[in-house]
Amino acid sequence: KQLKNKKIKLGAQNVFFEKNGAYTGEVSAQMLHDIGVDYVIVGHSERRAMGETNEIINKKLISSLKAGLIPILCVGESNRGAHDGFYLATVREQLSLCLANISKSQIKQIVVAYEPVWALSSTPDRHDSTPHDFEEMKIYIRKILTDMFGQATALSVCIIYGGSANKDNAGSYLSI
């Protein structure tokens, strides 16, 4: 309640797709909405590593939208081969399956976060992502969204960087 008239927005790190039922430890989208949450992260790499599938992520997106939340959909590859193109196919598959049954009006309410798992600070043998990597993937994500929803709709979707950033590179990511 104290945040209601502030410029601060509240977000949650996870959501459950069922509205109610015997799901101990899970928090529904409606419960998050009722306590004033605005945003919810869906499809984070750590959740995927625990077995969360694209189909479950799709259910979470739909549930979050129905409850009036703004979902932040994380997509990204676990490794990036220099020439194999596999990383592109991974992101295309994630978007295609996670956004199944999402309408043009609904996609405009979703934030897409590019989260390169290989660049996260918690990943063993990680290496740095560059603003160029993000720029390339942002263009690719926008193309996939254009294929799925049309250019005008795709251009209205917010795409952000969700990997490791620091004081030295944050400005470069913000300029993309």
Model feature map: region roles:
Residues 1-176:
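Active-site loop-to-helix "anion-binding N-cap" substructures in soluble metabolic enzymes
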